[in-house]
Amino acid sequence: MRALTIAGRGAAPAVADLPVSHLDAGQVRVAVEAASVNGIDVAAAAGYLWDRMPHEFPVVLGRDFAGTVDSVGSDVTRWKSGDRVAGVITAMALGSGAICEVVNADATVLVAVPAGLSALDAAAVGLAGVAATDLIAALGLTADDVVLVSGASGGVGAFAVQLAARAGAKVIATARGGDAARFVRDLGAAEVVDHTEGLAAQVRAAAPEGLTAVIHAAGDPAQLAALLISGGRLASVVGATPDQVGRADVTTTPVLAVATPDKLSGLLEAAASGALRVPVARTYRLDEAPQAISDFASPKLGKLVIAIR
């Protein structure tokens, strides 16, 4: 099979041919139709995770996937050949990934792709949608909250804007002007502030009584936390710590997205019904996947998705 790989320490991401691994009991072989790019893939490709996660070379990049069941291992009764499924690879080691033609997944982590939802959209939800869900839960957002979403036009941020608005909170989103501002407004942001031009003054104008919560998906956590009222909350998907936030009167929660079938299934159902918009910024072919890794850090409106077949 073809896969987006890192051959060894210091190697650049490249599409390579790999053997398909043996299908174990309890596993499902999925013919992958689409996968998406997340920050963990870019960090792995850049070598930032060498000392943080075990690496089993060649590392196949990618966490999110959607496709069709090809075959099932012994003891699997929930799935059959031809079923449309999606999943998130949750292993704490880097090795088996999702940006490839075939994934052998534990049957218990898969969810059904609802009728009417494309594989591209199902794959785009994945880890970013789960991270946004976990951020909202960490903050416990309600209609009484005024929340700033930083990095609102990226994958996690775009889902977080929608979920925060659905929770009833007033959402202030950071985005550059023009298309990015229109994009986050369409997702449910009540106000948009340009993080490149006097962020504090813009936020104070949009929320004169101060912010009660911050979703930190980008930017300086201390700068964002300074805009919170005393007793406010900051949830960070990029690992901000209380020391980095620098305020003892603010609750800081680092969020590590935990993908479960229940969370993913709920997100896919919401996407299929139209209650959740799946923001796909660009779609790449598998042979263009290394470029998607390179493009991840550039400004974009939503997720980067790889069409496998």
What are these regions (language model features)?
Residues 31, 78, 88-151:
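NAD(P)H dinucleotide-binding glycine-rich loop of Rossmann-like/cofactor-binding domains
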Residues 21-36, 49-91:
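Glycine-rich beta-strand-centered segment in the early N-terminal region that forms part
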Residues 218-279, 308-309:
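Glycine-rich phosphate-binding loop and adjacent beta-alpha segment
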Residues 1, 264-309:
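C-terminal hydrophobic helical "lid"/dimerization subdomain
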Residues 198-209:
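Short amphipathic alpha-helix with an adjacent loop that forms part of the alpha/beta core around
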Residues 70, 172, 235:
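Conserved beta-strand positions in the Rossmann-like core of class I SAM-dependent methyltransferases
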